Amino acid sequence: DAYDQHYYRTWMHELPPLRHMHRGAVLDVHHAIVPLTARARPSTQHLLQSAQLLPGQPGVHVLSPPDMVLHSAAHLFHESEFERGFRGVVDLDALLREFGAETDFWRCLLERSQVLGLEWPLHHALRYTQIIMDTQVPDFASEALAGSVPTSAWRSRLRDAVYLRALLPAHASTQDAWTPFARGALYVRGHTLRMPLHLLAPHLLRKTFYGLRPKGYP
């Protein structure tokens, strides 16, 4: 509707999904990796300047390996709905396993996280892929990022308790009574990371109101 179009085009990092009228294929067009209203706003120009040509595809560029990891980390840890969070962890694990053996990858990854202001999403990405997927991460990388998040013991325990519930697959064997609360807390956190309160509150109120209306109501 008109509100959603305005919301996407004014505040978001992407256009509304474009659907082919015959095939039904959906195309997402992004002009940034997080919303324009997010607390951390990595420079799209920095990402484009470091993009690399895709071999065998003239004129086609992809993000550099460090930026691929940071994009995946930023997307996952700015998320508000974690029902598919495990897929994000698997994606990060695959990227780190593929690029981790390359010369200077880890040094470049840390440097890029500073340039783009994404140290804390990278911290979370490395920590939880290590715990969940047994991803191999050099000690110096984890140590370099330790200061990007609150380090008090109780905060670390709380953060782990929440993320290690929310990031596991949505299955009875991986959930407990606290899992809905963990996902609920991250739902709120994700929205506050992406939008300041003076914009978030009216947006959520409007979406809640329209979500409660009967189907077919004008």
Q: Which residues does each predicted region cover?
A:
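Conserved NTP-donor binding/palm subdomain of two-metal-ion nucleotidyltransferases/polymerases, i.e.
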Residues: 1-218
